[in-house]
């Protein structure tokens, strides 16, 4: 007869650490960042402690205080991608468990494993065992990344697991859309919203990486990185690394200066000067000439119509025109962007853009008479 082992008799040191299932967010080891050239900068410069997390100091200080007082509740961190949610939880794990934190956390990506079976098996098995590897009974941590992608049945099952194993386990739920998480789970967690990073904090962190990698980036290039990332630090670091690799001259020991144009060309976004030129044509040239010129610059620089529409919409706010005309332009451009999202013909939609501006021009001229 097989001898059964109680969950309390299991030593976590004897359990093989689980391989985290995530979206490329590999857990960085305790200590200084790895120095391998092949390491993505997103992982190489991931914050190792709560003090290293950029921005959100009020949230970080609150979590730090709860950790110091041994009063850490279940957490629900939500907000746009690249704002430091996962990095914050991993920093908390390092602070709580030190070098043995891998044995004390279960990291799952709910986009990959989001069914009810994961909650009933993997999560419940991990939560039901108690660890004495740190010399005393200590709570463990379950990190559910992209929890908003879990099915409703899995979320209801998770609610019961959280209630049952609160004494031995803390749960940290991470998601982009809090409205996709059932109210029963939200009420069992302390919620923190991570807003997009502002330009000041992003610039400071990017300058740190630029200095560490010994890059040369112009002020305009840095501003372009901040603008294109829209508060997403992960996106900013990926763009910086891609631009560095694309602009690096193999014949020289040092990379050339990264400019605004390098950043825009690497990402495929239209340059601000190109948008100004296109807007000038739309507001001044006849239909046939404007169509020819915009088509030519679109083909020559490999621009996408949807990117042109987005940038022109932002540019409209900088132009002095009657409010009624501005409202009509934005409404028409929104319809064009909607049609483009369904794969409508680019040439037809380019004609629609020019027609929209031609009609707006006629209204402005008529009002001036």
Curated annotation (Swiss-Prot):
Disruption phenotype: Moderately dwarfed plants with small organs due to reduced cell proliferation rate. Enhanced resistance to pathogens. The gene is RFC5. Keywords: ATP-binding, DNA replication, DNA-binding, Nucleotide-binding, Nucleus, Plant defense. This is Replication factor C subunit 5. Functions in cell replication and proliferation. May be involved in chromatin assembly and remodeling. Plays a role in the negative control of pathogenesis-related gene expression and systemic acquired resistance (SAR). One of its GO terms (biological process) is negative regulation of defense response. InterPro entries: AAA+_ATPase, ATPase_AAA_core, DNA_pol3_clamp-load_cplx_C, DNA_Rep/Repair_Clamp_Loader, P-loop_NTPase, Rep_factorC_C, RFC_lid. PANTHER family: REPLICATION FACTOR C / DNA POLYMERASE III GAMMA-TAU SUBUNIT (PTHR11669), REPLICATION FACTOR C SUBUNIT 5 (PTHR11669:SF9). Induction: By salicylic acid (SA). The keyword DNA-binding applies. GO terms for molecular function: ATP binding; ATP hydrolysis activity; DNA binding. Disulfide bonds: none annotated. It is found in: Nucleus. GO terms for cellular component: nucleus. It holds the Pfam family AAA. Belongs to the activator 1 small subunits family. Coiled coil: none annotated. Residues 21-40 are annotated as: Disordered. NCBIfam families: PRK00440.1 (NF001679). Heterotetramer of subunits RFC2, RFC3, RFC4 and RFC5 that can form a complex with RFC1. Signal peptide: none annotated.
């Amino acid at each position: 007869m097989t001898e059964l082992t109680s969950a309390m008799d299991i030593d976590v040191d004897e359990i093989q650490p689980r391989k985290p299932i995530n979206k490329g967010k590999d857990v960085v080891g305790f200590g200084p960042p790895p120095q391998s050239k092949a390491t993505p900068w997103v992982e190489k410069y991931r914050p190792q402690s709560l003090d290293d997390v950029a921005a959100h100091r009020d949230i970080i200080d609150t979590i730090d205080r709860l950790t110091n007082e041994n009063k850490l509740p279940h957490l629900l961190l939500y907000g746009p991608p690249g704002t430091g949610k996962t990095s914050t939880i991993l920093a908390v794990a390092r602070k709580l468990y030190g070098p043995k934190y891998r044995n004390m956390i279960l990291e799952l990506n709910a986009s990959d494993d989001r069914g009810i079976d994961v909650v009933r098996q993997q999560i419940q098995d991990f939560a039901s065992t108690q660890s004495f590897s740190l010399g005393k009974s200590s709570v463990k941590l379950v990190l559910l990344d992209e929890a908003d992608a879990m099915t409703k049945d899995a979320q209801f099952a998770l609610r019961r697991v959280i209630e049952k194993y609160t004494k031995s386990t803390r749960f940290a739920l991470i998601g982009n859309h809090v409205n996709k998480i059932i109210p029963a789970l939200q009420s069992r967690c302390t919620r923190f919203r991570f807003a997009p990073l502002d330009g000041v904090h992003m610039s400071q962190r990017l300058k740190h990486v630029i200095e560490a990698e010994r890059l040369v980036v112009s002020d305009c290039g840095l501003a372009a990185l901040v603008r294109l990332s829209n508060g997403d630090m992960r996106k900013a670091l990926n763009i910086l690394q891609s631009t560095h690799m694309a602009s690096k001259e193999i014949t020289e020991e040092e990379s050339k200066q990264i400019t605004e144009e390098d950043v825009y060309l690497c990402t495929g976004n239209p340059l601000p000067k190109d948008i100004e030129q296109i807007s000038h044509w739309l507001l001044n040239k006849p239909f046939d000439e404007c169509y020819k010129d915009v088509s030519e610059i679109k083909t020559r620089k490999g621009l996408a119509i949807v990117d042109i529409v987005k940038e022109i919409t932002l540019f409209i706010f900088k132009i002095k025109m009657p409010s009624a005309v501005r409202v009509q332009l934005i409404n028409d451009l929104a319809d064009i962007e909607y049609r483009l999202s369904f794969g409508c013909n680019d040439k037809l939609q380019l004609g629609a853009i020019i027609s929209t501006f031609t009609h707006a021009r006629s209204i402005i001229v008529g009002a001036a008479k």
